[in-house]
Regions:
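Basic, flexible linker segments flanking DNA-binding modules
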Residues: 2-103, 198, 259-266
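Generic alpha-helical secondary structure signal
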Residues: 2-6, 22, 149, 179, ...
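RNase H-like polynucleotidyl transferase catalytic core
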Residues: 72-77, 168-171, 186-204, 220-226
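An active-site-proximal beta-strand-loop segment
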Residues: 97-137, 143-144
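Active-site beta-loop-alpha junctions of metal-dependent nucleic acid enzymes
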Residues: 121, 139-161
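Acidic/histidine-rich, metal-coordinating catalytic segments
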Residues: 161-176, 195, 256-257
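C-terminal domain-tail junction helix/linker
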Residues: 178, 185, 189, 211-269
């Protein structure tokens, strides 16, 4: 003889299972907003911002149980030949991989990344990141990499570059052009260039470019050539920059967004 009440009890979900279900829905809502890119640490930080104080172990367990884990970006292997001496007449690697700064506007890093468009061409995005706040402080898109493309990027930095600001890039043709160096000099900035062929010298902004593709483009469009016009790809770049600055919390900033962190430190100074 089987006790009927014990059968019903075994079929009834436990309180823990019910709580997990509710909790999983909260996590799912956050993952949907952030394109499935929040890992355990950032998810825990985001939940706390919403007043939900939980142990990161529970977050990890529920994320795994409900298959809500983040999209993992594969670590890139850097194969770089290192040329220690820059070519004659060019600025050296003044930044020297010191990727931190005490104040906004002290150190800026820049790079151009490219994204495919439906006509077989590319959407080039020129981005500048502040090493203090982690904010993207300039973003320009174009159909080709010209000197003017680089100058337009500098125009966006009006008021953000101060005398002595370090401006670091790789040795791309835009950045080694005398007119670009002169424009920086006129703004009072100190130019710094990566060593030839050494991607690690500009790792922070190169990492951002990879993160943008992994968090924003690939989840929505997959890899390969996308069926989007230049204007559509360009719009997505600007949307990601806004999201990255204003909504995406960062562990190294104490789980604040880049914009929140800048406001906090400028109020304290």
């Amino acid at each position: 003889h089987v006790n009927r009440s014990s059968v019903y009890k075994s079929l009834k979900p436990s309180q823990r299972a019910l709580d997990d279900e509710v909790f999983a829905q909260q996590i799912k809502a956050i993952q949907l907003k952030h394109k499935g890119c929040y890992g355990v640490d950032r998810m825990t930080g985001e939940l706390r911002r919403k007043g939900i104080y939980v142990n990161h172990k529970r977050v990890a367990r529920v994320m795994k149980l409900y298959k809500l884990n983040a999209i993992i970006r594969k670590k890139r292997n850097y194969f770089c030949d290192v040329e220690q001496v820059p070519r004659k007449g060019l600025p050296g690697n003044v930044l020297n991989r010191k990727f931190s700064a005490e104040k906004p506007g002290k150190k800026l890093v820049s790079d151009v990344t490219y994204l495919p468009t439906s006509d077989g061409q590319w959407c080039y995005a020129s981005l500048v990141k502040d090493l203090c706040t982690s904010e993207i402080v300039a973003c320009v898109t174009g159909k080709s990499q010209t000197l003017n493309f680089g100058i337009e990027t500098l125009k966006q930095l009006d008021g953000k570059i101060h005398p002595g600001t370090l401006f670091h890039t790789d040795q791309g043709s835009i950045y080694t052009h005398p007119a670009f160096s002169y424009a920086l000099e006129k703004m009072g900035a100190v130019q710094s260039l990566s060593r030839k062929g050494n991607c690690l010298d500009n790792a922070v902004i190169e990492s951002f470019n990879g993160t943008m593709k992994c968090e924003w483009f690939y989840p929505q469009l997959g890899k390969g050539r996308w069926n989007l016009s230049f204007e559509e790809v360009s719009k997505m770049v600007f949307e990601y920059v806004k999201y990255y600055n204003e909504e995406r919390i960062q562990k190294k900033l104490g789980y604040l967004t880049a914009t929140e962190y800048r406001r906090q430190i400028t109020q304290n100074h």
